Structures are given as C-alpha cells and as structure tokens.
Amino acid sequence: EDVKEELKNYRYIYVWTGNDYLVYQSNPDYRKYNMQKYLYRLSADFQQILNIYEIPNWITQMAFIDDKIYISTKNVYPKKDGDRVIGISSDDYGIYYSTDYFEWRKLDFEGYDLIEFRNQLFVGNNLCFNDDVIKILYETYSGYPKYKVGQYLCEIDYRNEYKTDNNTVLAFSNDGIYWAYMIVDKANIQGISELGDEILIQKDYRNYYACNKEEVFSQLREKLPNNPVYVKFNDDILGFDEPPIIEDGSTLVPMRFLFEQMGADVEWDSETQTATATLDNKAVTFSIDNVNARINNKPAKMDVPARLINGKTMVPLRFLSENMGYDVDWDDDNRTAIIK
C-alpha cells in the first residue's frame, strides 16, 4: 500500500505496454543516490502492483524493440559544501537492455540519449543492435534525435550554419542517417510535438506555434530519399549531407566526405571542374560529366561519370574506392555499399 501511494506522486512516468503500465520515477531523488532503484509494473486499472523490478540506476528514457526493453540510466547525487547541499551532480550514464526485466545487460557504450524509431534504437549518433553499436559519422549534422513527428525523427539543430539569434533550424530524418533542414522564423524553441493535423513548436511552457503537418511533410518528401542507399566505411555508417544515388547500377556519393574518411588529399580545379585525389602512392584524376579518368597519370574509364548535384561533387564509389586501395562489397538486402 505504501508503494501504491508513492506511485500517485507526480514525479512518476507511466508507460503503457499494451497490457499494463511500467512506472518509473521521472525526477531522480539525489538523496537516494546510494540506494536500490526500482521499476514497477502496474495493472491497467491502476489497482494492483503486478511486479517490482530492480534496475541498475535511475531511468531517464525507455524504449521497446521486439522482445527487449531498453533503458537509459544515470546516477544523481548531492554536491556538497561541508554538510550543506549546494547542487546536484550526475554521472555513470549507461544503456541497458533486458528480455525479462530481471537480468539487465549493459551496452559497451557510454551514452544516455536514446530513441526508438522504426524498430531501431538510436543512442546519440549511434545505431544499436543488441550488443553491437554502429557509429554514424555525419558530414555536418551535429545533433541527437530527440523527437518523433509522424514518420520522421526531429531535432533542434543549434549548431547549423543557418542558425541565427532570431530563428531556429529544425532537422528532420526518415531514417536517422540522412537529414533535411527547415528554418523556423522563431527563436528559443524548446520542443517539437504533433497534435492532429498540426505540428506544435513549443516556445515555453505556455506558448506554442502551430504549422500544418502535411505541408511540412510534403517538403520533407522532396528533400529526403524514399529508398536510400547507405555506405559503411570501416564498420561506420556515413551520414552524407547529400544522400548517395544510383546511376546505371553505380553508386555515386559525395566526394569530399568520403575522401576525408580515407585520409586522402583532394585538389579541385573549379575552372575545369576536375578533381585529383591522392592517397599514399595512388592518385586519381576525374572531371564532372566525363567518364575518362587517370590513375597515376595513366588513362582509365569509369562506368559512369562524376556528377555535380546540389553543389556536391558525386563520384562513383566503387571505382574511386578500389583505386584508392579499398575493397567494396554490396549488401543488396540493406542497399548498403561496404568499404573496407
């Protein structure tokens, strides 16, 4: 009965599982930093505590994928000046998962921002599969996805080049890899949500701006690929600013970010639209819209030429990678080019 009374406290978050509720404390109590923490299972009618589970630490976020529950945790403890509490500190961040709520396994990764999207778990700039963590290397995107709006992940991008003191840049993605940006002529935005046919942009606890959801989604469908191609480089996923495309069976990717990962130097002649990439003792020269190339100053021919798309030089992935000394495989099921 004491626990049932405690769960009436406003500091608890209730998560509906489809049959009952999982309940955890939303505002960690620093006074209990060295005590056992718990997760509660509550009946659908709120009348019965079905189970009490021990958890590794205070829960900050929760997600369900297939038969697993994932929790983001942290420890909160008092910061003291002598015997006087002068603040609150937190540390020991971790991501755990369980299939039975009793035994928890920790991901070998230090992080705390998690979100489930399309049955995948994103932790910061990482994609997690059970015990495996795949890092996403973004070309310029610098945020962590925190919101879900319809079929899109969303984030407030504070470091975007178009951010000013008088606006807010919102980043949207339909896969967590490639992002499109929308500028909102409002400053100090605190959060994003949706209600019916509208997207709500929260300025503070009382004030919201509303915009038509379908108008926003229509713009995003034009900017983001519907059937994207992915690139893995040394087991990391590359989050290009301009998503790769396929032309006549060849994958074209943004030149500069790919070569940066390889450690290659690139020289660009804007007058002739010709690039030369150099890595160790290898040099490849090619031009926009021209299948003729040179490898170590010897003539060669590409299956498709490099293209200039939305200001990005897009180059044939296999030709450039293999001539830089890398192997390229194609995962047809996941539409992924794998460079090693």
Task: Name these PLM-found stretches.
Residues 3-17, 56-66, 109-119, 140-150, ...:
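Repeated scaffold domains used in trafficking and secretory/extracellular systems
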Residues 11-15, 20-26, 31-32, 68-73, ...:
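Short beta-strand elements that form the blades of beta-propeller/WD-repeat-like
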Residues 2-5, 48-53, 104-107, 134-138, ...:
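A short beta-strand motif characteristic of beta-propeller blades
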Residues 34-36, 90-92, 166-167:
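A detector of repeated loop/turn-to-beta-strand junctions in beta-rich toroidal repeat architectures
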Residues 46, 101-103, 133, 176-178, ...:
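Short coil turn/linker residues within repeat-based beta-strand modules
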Residues 190-222:
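Blade-level signature of beta-propeller repeat domains, shared across WD40, Kelch, NHL, RCC1
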Residues 217-340:
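Primary recognition of N-terminal secretory signal peptides and signal-anchoring hydrophobic helices
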Residues 42-43, 98, 130, 173, ...:
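Conserved Ser/Thr-centered positions that define the repeating blades of beta-propeller domains
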